[in-house]
């Protein structure tokens, strides 16, 4: 249905068209917003093929918004380098960090170092600044299908109760029966 998000068999929840702060949704109220400028990339089509209903919206920052908390900026290698060269990269990352509780950058494709003639050291410096100085995680993605898979994983995580990821215990800390289950 129009204006709703569907993730697998999860109940549908209306999409929000603004990024104003709101109460944290329950695990059953997963919302995904896609900036209308992102639709030509093919990621929205990939999400639709996975059962997610998306509707275009205009996000002031970022390309995807999950549950009003996770803001995702998607950049191809060429986009990343182009943003470095025109001076907009760090402004975009700073705005993403200020706007969302959990900002993420998805770096898509394998052309980061070949898209343009830019010193690899400069690219690595920008990557280090984004993660080290701004604290924004960078998730690598090979293509639009993998980007959709990453967004699906983020959607699934947001369905769960908020909290840190649960790490599996080290093998030596488990009984033989527990090791078989893991």
For every predicted segment, state its role.
Residues 19-51:
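Short, charged N-terminal beta->alpha structural module
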Residues 2-19, 36, 53-69, 73-182:
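Extended, alpha-helix-rich binding/interface surfaces that flank or overlap catalytic cores
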């Amino acid at each position: 249905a129009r204006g709703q998000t569907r993730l697998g068999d999860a109940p549908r929840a209306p999409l929000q068209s603004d990024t104003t702060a709101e109460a944290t949704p329950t695990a059953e109220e997963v919302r995904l917003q896609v900036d209308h400028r992102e639709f030509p990339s093919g990621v929205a089509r990939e999400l639709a093929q996975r059962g997610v209903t998306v509707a275009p919206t205009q996000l002031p920052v970022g390309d995807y918004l999950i549950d009003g908390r996770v803001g995702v900026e998607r950049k191809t290698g060429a986009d990343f380098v182009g943003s470095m060269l025109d001076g907009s990269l760090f402004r975009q990352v700073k705005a993403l960090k200020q706007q969302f509780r959990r900002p993420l950058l998805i770096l898509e494709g394998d052309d980061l170092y070949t898209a343009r003639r830019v010193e690899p050291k400069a690219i690595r410096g920008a990557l280090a600044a984004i993660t080290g100085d701004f604290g924004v995680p960078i998730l690598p993605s090979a293509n639009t299908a993998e980007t959709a898979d990453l967004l699906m994983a983020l959607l699934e995580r947001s369905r769960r109760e908020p909290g840190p990821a649960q790490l599996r215990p080290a093998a030596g800390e488990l009984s033989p029966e527990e090791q078989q289950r893991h």
